[in-house]
Design a protein with these regions (language model features):
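PRPP-associated nucleotide enzymes
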Residues: 1-394
């Protein structure tokens, strides 16, 4: 993949760029805006004074928008400036439970449903006046409800169709739980992006004595659903791959699902090897810790868990104990969703910043450029591996 400085974006932009980070996504939005302002100022675009490039180089691409609430808890979307003719990018973090609002005098934490409703409110406030509407939703809303088992709703498919009906042209997400959910909107733009490169770079920056070959390292999938991620990581790093599958008790239902009896391992020996467990999300963390415990029992050397989304729904205590007990040596997640100050303070936590990558995607899409080279990180991964092996700064 080419970096921003190497990309030649001469196409006329679809429209003047506008970014709307919704409530709870402001920090990521500000970082993305900072990169875009810097790049466009440095590029000294030869056509920037052309009328077709009007508004190309600005001090700020953020659009003022808000979602105030009435005392009853109802809300409305408001735009503080005109968006007519703009190429609009809406950024939403549906997992940010730290945002609150007042409901009849009580403090309510925002759920994914609330965030999705806010997204629709701002799209409605645009009122069809924008040139194009793009939604950047790192954690795809309802992505875990992607298929029907018995009498269930297909929430993710319904949400995608609703956005398309409202005029959304492109939906950009990261590590969708099942990318096939795009079948719900086959004629619209849908991209699911993997942060594998950012994980590798984050790990190499933090751990200086890794031996990256099949004799000393393995990539592990904690379940059968995530094997594609582990296979890709193993291929680009030249490692062996292993996986666990969940043995469930189908005679019982606990908390809406069949309880896991055991995690069974399939793969070659992990003895003496560093292990990377890769998954799309860490929810409660029970599965990751059980898998790591089993790998330690099999005499794995160091264990690093990488997941695009760190939800940590039951807190960090079990991870603290796993770290202190030598079961887990590091946890990598991205800043695509809300991160608590407690998480960021942990000695074993490695934060992978995705803001530069998102800025590159927005910059390319605004020029109607191809995303193919951006979405394939093979070349960048090999470059960073070579730097690591040569002892250069990453």
């Amino acid at each position: 993949m080419l970096s921003r400085s190497e990309r030649i974006l001469e196409n006329i932009p679809v429209g003047s760029l506008g970014i709307i980070p919704l409530l709870g996504c402001e920090e990521l939005g500000n970082k993305v805006n900072g990169y875009l302002v810097k790049w466009r100022r440095e590029s000294a675009h030869e056509h920037k004074n052309d009328v077709a490039f009007s508004g190309y180089e600005k001090e700020n691409y953020l659009i003022n928008a808000s979602v105030p609430r009435f005392g009853s808890g109802e809300a409305k979307g408001i735009l503080g400036e005109s968006v007519r003719g703009k190429d609009i990018y809406l950024m939403v973090d549906v997992c940010n439970y730290n945002v609150t609002y007042s409901l009849t005098g009580n403090t309510n934490h925002m759920s994914p449903d609330d965030h999705f409703q806010n997204l629709k409110r701002i799209i409605a406030a645009v009122g069809g006046k924008g040139r194009r509407i793009n939604v950047i939703m790192p954690f795809l809303y309802e992505s875990r409800q992607h298929k029907r088992t018995s009498r269930e709703s297909l929430d993710c498919a319904l949400a995608l169709q609703e956005l398309v009906r409202m005029g959304v042209d492109n939906i950009i997400t990261f590590d969708a739980h099942d990318p096939r959910v795009s079948n719900a909107i086959p004629l619209s733009g849908f991209e699911t992006i993997s942060p594998t490169y950012q994980f590798i770079k984050g790990l190499l920056r933090k751990v200086k004595d890794l031996q990256i070959d099949s004799e000393h390292m393995m990539a592990i999938s904690p379940d059968e659903g995530g094997t594609n991620r582990a296979v890709y990581l193993a291929n680009v790093l030249g490692l062996d791959m292993g996986m666990f599958y969940k043995r469930r008790d189908y005679t019982q239902i606990v908390n809406g699902r069949n309880p896991i009896v055991a995690h069974e391992f399939l793969g070659s020996s992990v003895e003496g090897k560093d292990v990377i467990i890769i998954d799309d999300m860490i929810s409660s963390g029970d599965s990751i810790i059980e898998v790591a415990t089993e790998l330690k029992r099999r005499k794995a050397k160091r264990i690093f868990a990488a997941a695009t989304f760190g939800l940590f729904t039951n807190g960090m205590e079990k991870f603290d104990k796993a770290y202190e007990g030598g079961i887990i040596d590091g946890i990598l997640t991205t800043n695509l969703i809300y991160q608590t100050p407690n998480l960021l303070s942990k000695p074993y936590y490695i934060n992978c910043d995705m803001s530069k990558y998102i800025a590159l995607i927005i910059d390319t899409l605004n020029h109607d450029g191809s995303l193919s080279e951006i979405l394939s990180p093979n070349e960048r991964i090999q470059n960073v591996l070579q730097k690591y092996k040569n002892g250069e700064t990453i």
